[in-house]
Amino acid sequence: MPDLPSGTVTFVFSDVEGSTALLKRLGDRYDEVISEHRRLMRERFTEHGGVEIDTQGDAFFFAFARARDAVTAAVEAQRAHAEQKWPDGVTVLVRMGLHTGEPAVGSEGYLGLDVVRAARLCTAGSGGHVLLSETTRALVGSSLPEGVSVFPLGERRLKDIDEPERVFELEIEGAIQPQAPVRAAPPADDADWETDLGARMAQRIEASVRRSVEASLERVVSDVDALAERAAKRPGQVAERLEDER
């Protein structure tokens, strides 16, 4: 058993969504994908102080002494999976759940509901999701990696957790965007969750359009600058063209 962080600890659970489908598609090359997935996860998480508690198949359980380090590791791992060239053009979709608490430590490792809560946050997500509990969100504050924002999902029901949990999603530039909504349902009396989801989708579309427009404007400015530079070098030709157009 490794030396475990104690006191206030942030847990991260992760797994690969659709691993059975990947196995069917890739056959013998599936082992290559899982080996690379494990390498990417271990490199990013241990680099930021994560302690590997357990792993099984494509799933991991890490512990961190600081919530900010856990978030940074999760972000970098998601971006690394997006950048990786996978066999046969497949996409490896990783979901993660982060929760911070003050767990008890027994002879076999961590004990208590804090571990369960982090695990349930992971399984509440779909591939590409990084979900935070309210405690982790509060500890991270504004100390987010560049290109990362936090979107509140409101209260959600997590399996085996009696009270609803306020859940937050990391929106990460340069990572694979989730293709499915969060699986955990809101409380039965929350009538606004569909409206919240629609507003969130609208915000994503608006952000995508804004990035596209900004990129187009940058290209236009670049083209105009190039034309201006060319005109400065050949003023006579430009003047002749203007005269012809008259």
Predicted regions and their residues:
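Intrinsically disordered, glycine/charged-rich C-terminal tails and inter-domain linkers
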Residues: 1, 128, 135-246
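Catalytic NTP-binding/metal-coordinating core of nucleotidyl cyclase/transferase enzymes
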Residues: 1-75, 79-80
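A near-ubiquitous, low-amplitude feature marking generic local secondary-structure context
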Residues: 2-6, 13, 17, 24, ...
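Acidic-enriched, low-complexity/disordered segments with a strong bias for Aspartate over Glutamate
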Residues: 3, 15, 28-31, 54, ...
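Short, acidic Gly/Pro/Ser/Thr-rich loop/turn segments
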Residues: 19, 105, 175-177
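Alpha-helix boundary/capping and short turn/kink residues
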Residues: 27-31, 130, 214
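Catalytic beta-strand-to-alpha-helix segment of the class III nucleotidyl cyclase homology domain
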Residues: 39-42, 61-172
